[in-house]
A protein has these predicted regions:
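Hydrophobic/anchoring residues in structured secondary elements
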Residues: 32, 65-67, 105
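Short, well-ordered alpha-helical segments enriched in acidic and aromatic residues
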Residues: 16-29
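Surface-exposed, charged secondary-structure patches
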Residues: 49-90
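Short beta-strand edge/turn micro-motifs at domain boundaries
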Residues: 88-107
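Core segments of small alpha/beta cavity-forming domains
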Residues: 5-8, 20-21
Length: 107
């Protein structure tokens, strides 16, 4: 499956637990919605993913990717140290100039 470079980096940096490199996938004003919370800007996003990486040690296995213009959805099998692992989640991206402007994680 062919993925945009930023989505490949998003997956790779999560696999190696590099929260700083993960945050670099996002624009300065990016917004992330996950687990009922909103995270605004690179600094908050880096703190969110650092906590998530430490708590869940999750890995993503891409199952499907659909794109329409700047909007796309990655469906992935997510495994890690959390109840119900593995689960299938959808990552709804809005990509702008090769960086993620908006991400919403849903089941």
């Amino acid at each position: 499956m062919e993925l945009p470079q930023v989505v490949e980096r998003f997956i790779e940096t999560q696999h190696i637990f590099d929260s700083k490199a993960f945050a670099e996938c996002f624009t300065e004003s990016a917004i992330v919605h996950d687990e009922g919370k909103t995270h605004n800007g690179k600094e908050e996003i880096q703190q969110w993913i650092k906590h998530s990486m430490e708590a869940y040690k999750s890995a993503l296995e891409p199952l499907n990717y659909q794109q329409s213009g700047s909007k796309s959805v990655l469906t992935a099998n997510v495994s890690g140290m959390f109840p119900g692992s593995p689960i299938v989640l959808k990552f709804h991206f809005d990509i702008n100039n090769g960086q993620i402007q908006h991400l919403k994680v849903t089941d």
